[in-house]
Amino acid sequence: MAGNRNNDMNVYCSFCGKSQDEVKKIIAGNGVFICNECVALSQEIIKEELAEEVLADLAEVPKPKELLEILNQYVVGQDRAKRALAVAVYNHYKRVSYTESSDDDVDLQKSNILMIGPTGSGKTFLAQTLAKSLNVPFAIADATSLTEAGYVGEDVENILLKLIQAADYNVERAERGIIYVDEIDKIAKKGENVSITRDVSGEGVQQALLKIIEGTVASVPPQGGRKHPNQEMIQINTKNILFIVGGAFDGIEDLVKQRLGEKIIGFGQTSRKIDDNASYMQEIISEDIQKFGLIPEFIGRLPVVAALELLTAEDLVRILTEPRNALVKQYQTLLSYDGVELEFDQDALLAIADKAIERKTGARGLRSIIEETMLDIMFEIPSQEDVTKVRITKAAVEGTDKPVLETA
């Protein structure tokens, strides 16, 4: 029997039977021994099983039409962007599944995504919804907090740590996750001419991001922060991580107009008529993005461009009421726990939408406006047992009157 044999002084592995002289190290446990070779083999078996589980999950990726249906349940408008995202995400995970399970000689490159759209148009929410529907780890990073190596700030590898943490430190699962990098337009080069001074927040960060976006084996500090000598690192391969980057790119429509041979408003007549800036956003090509300040190599790793439109008041009202997790439904549910019915007048919903447009916050500002309107109600209602219904009026939203209360 393998193990510690009493007839000699040698120690044997309880699993493979090799003696301590035949292996590098034997670890003693409670009545059992295991050699370094069996430890390595066990780790390899576990790693393979985890990878198989991940691939099995990816094999069930919804088709583009199914992804679009899921997005439609949560995201109002942005139909062109949703279709582009659905196709890109499906193709990405199809590529991951087939390249890991076949010996095809064709090298399928991944299609990372660039989303361009104004603040509050739904860029972050689209990325979050996709990751949730696919049941893959998801992490968000702000490009403005990143700096290139050697400068005070956050290393790009810390983005990968967020993804690893979202995967509960299951690296194999993290390697098939989605990372959304917001405010990518804020690290554009300031002008097309390269400065002789160091560009801490611009081109240098783009170059650092480029390495992990195109696919590399990165060393990530387990606790975040800067790397230190002799520090244990987590190794993660980024070749199958889907990167979605987004930004407002304020003013890029002027670059599109110039390329199309039109003069910017205020400097002359246009030679070609396009209805509005939203239409110009659909005309964006890589040349415009490069002129804005992203380097060609970085743009080349973002072949899918999805342009999001500025949300109208009607869009914002639909966002308030239609999605499965619509804000109006959430607040109605909250008050129902106190036995109170909540109703919003149609002109109250429009007033909320108008406030969000006035503040230039888009959809992300809707919750704070409702919170302002509902604060006193949510404070008083739990103590007023005779109230059965609350009606939010336009005047209540504008702050000129209180919500209407109905009692039993």
Swiss-Prot record:
Please cite one Gene Ontology biological process associated with this protein. Answer: proteolysis involved in protein catabolic process
Give one GO molecular function term: unfolded protein binding
ClpX-type ZB domain location:
1-54
Function of this protein? ATP-dependent specificity component of the Clp protease. It directs the protease to specific substrates. Can perform chaperone functions in the absence of ClpP.
Indicate the quaternary assembly: Component of the ClpX-ClpP complex. Forms a hexameric ring that, in the presence of ATP, binds to fourteen ClpP subunits assembled into a disk-like structure with a central cavity, resembling the structure of eukaryotic proteasomes.
Query: Which family would the database say this protein is a member of?
Result: Belongs to the ClpX chaperone family.
Protein name in UniProt: ATP-dependent Clp protease ATP-binding subunit ClpX
Traced from the root, the source organism's taxonomic lineage reads:
Bacteria, Bacillati, Bacillota, Bacilli, Lactobacillales
Designated gene of the protein: clpX
